[in-house]
Amino acid sequence: MTTPVTILHGATVFTAAGGDPFEGSVVVAGDRIANVLTGPSAPSRSGRVIDLHGATLLPGLIDAHVHAAAVRADIQDQHRDLFDSELAVLTARSLTEMLERGFTTVRDAGGADAGYRRLIERGDLAGPRLLVSGRPLTQTGGHGDSRRATESHDFAACPRAQGMTHAVADGPDAVRHAAREELRRGADQIKVMAGGGVMSPTDRLESVQYSLAELSAAVGAAAASGTYVLAHAYTPEAIEVCVAAGVRSIEHGNLLNEPVARLMAQAGTFLVPTLVTYEKLYEQGEELGIPRANLDKLGAIIDAGVNSLRIARGAGVKIGSGSDLLGPMRVHQGREIALQAQALGAAGAIVAATRTNAELLGIDAETGTIEPGKAADLIAVDGDPLADPGLLADPGRLRLVMRAGRTHIDRTG
């Protein structure tokens, strides 16, 4: 059987592998990039030729922090209001929409289970390459413990539901068991809540959650299964404990300071900023039903986000890219790149959302750059996102979206 060949010709190509953009062509054979050619001439190889003049060809985008199952902005109550069947359909739809926004790989940071990954891998669901974390681990009263202060029942007595549920575990043994349980259920990596957050009802944003021993137990369980831990943390105090425990990536990190950034760089710990979620929570949160008590927590972090990137960059921390958007705010997923460009520059922000994220996720041999032999995860954007990264926030600018050689959006003709 002949392998189908597609020639993407005439675009400005930004490989994200190093070097400047250039006019050229990319040859796709089956699900792989077969060749990358410079110059205006179309390659002589036979195959379907797609004219991309006026567009920029990039690696497919990677979002290292999504919550596909956060189908409503007020995630604390969605499991009380939706049947599991409703939530499953809405979660599947959200994954398809991420692919249609140019994200060919996403890491779910809590909520989606391995079933969605299997659906995508089998071809039963159009969606990005998906790595799932299962249920995030949190301590009693920590970020993700959705019980209100007035509720006295044990967390385990809460009705089991899909979506934005968490595993409450206290003490190293319980944390180790909880991590192993999520791995048993198919998690690709483990998510822990190491500090306070915006969306939970009882914890303070500045609180440090989970001890070194507890975090080390989670890291050990993950490492024994050949994977890693990502940790929700805002403050230097919480981040420092995570680094000491061997956590691979810090999610958010808005209040990062220089001494702790240096520790992260020395340890090889990644930072995954999620600037866009704070912008959109501030703009839309109240009208979408998020309680005022939660939104009041934004003050300490919304203006600190870009500065944390500058601190991290100055210290040599590897910076990835996430969105963390909830419910209808997810339409702004691509805006994260423009926000990060304020600190990293446009090219740096695109690299964060492609090559660096691929390295973080351990899939850099497969995707993240435009190089021969890698998966044909590619997007073509009308215009020049290296001059205006805001173009990536508009899915209507996408002329082509290809994942593993399969075309999902084609507006070329």
Predicted regions mapped to residue ranges:
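Histidine/acidic-residue-rich catalytic or RNA/ligand-binding cores of hydrolases
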Residues: R72-Q76, P201, I239-A245, L275-I290, ...
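Histidine-centered divalent metal-coordination motifs
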Residues: G10, H65-H67, H232, H252
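N-terminal metal-binding scaffold of metallo-dependent hydrolase/deaminase domains
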Residues: M1-S44, L57, P385-D388, R406-T407
